[in-house]
Amino acid sequence: MKRKDAIIREFSLKKKKILTSDDLRAVCDKYGFDFGRTKIGLMNKGYLLTIFRGIYYLRDFNEKKTGVIKYSTDELLSEGLRLKGVGNWYFGLNTALKRMNLTHEIFAVDYVLNERFNRVRPMEIFGSNFLFVKIKPSLFSFGIEKTTTANDIPINYSDAEKTLLDMAYLYRLSGKSGEAIISLIEEYAGDVDKKKLINYAKNYPKTIGKIIAEALG
């Protein structure tokens, strides 16, 4: 039996599509396959697709033929983060605004706020670009909408109030003026619960709370 056939059959029997290097290595050891050669061969033939380093999606024969896979890019991101041990994360900033239909702009990247890592440049996952922004753990305790897909995979995004506060907070960290933050808040003031916004602001530096209060009048 060819390597790819054995590998694909083995994971199909396990109903496992998303796997780690350790998962693949274990099956290679079972069949006596060289791990490195097997991995490279599967990649070169388009069966093994990288989500993150050491985390992959394994296409079956039908997916390879049709070009259609079981999961969406957001689902692959979610599962990849889970396997990397990133428990706290959500789609935020402009990405959250888009998901809530609060903007009609089209953005080149999706913003993923998380507890573990920053990336200066976007990371491409299956044709979509994601920019990872690290924030402090205390900012994961409120304002996050948690949904589950038809494939039972969690997808998180910030609500409108938290989204604006995150934007204001990151604006401030990047050196933007208070006037820029006020302009941002005023633009979306009609789309948020002002009491919730003020309450959430207690979790951010006091300067943010003062600017929010000024923007709301």
Predicted regions and their residues:
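A residue-level signal for conserved active-site and pocket-lining positions in enzyme catalytic cores
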Residues: 24, 96, 164
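Short coil/loop linkers at secondary-structure junctions
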Residues: 30-34, 103, 207
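Hydrophobic alpha-helical interaction segments
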Residues: 141-217
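Residues that recognize and position ribonucleotide moieties
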Residues: 17, 89, 157
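Hydrophobic/aromatic-lined pockets within catalytic cores
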Residues: 29, 101, 169-173
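C-terminal intrinsically disordered extensions
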Residues: 24, 121-152, 207-208
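Short gly/ser-rich loop at a beta-strand->alpha-helix junction or flexible surface loop bordering the NTP-binding
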Residues: 50-61, 67-139
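Short beta-edge/loop segments at beta->alpha junctions of small alpha/beta modules
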Residues: 2-85
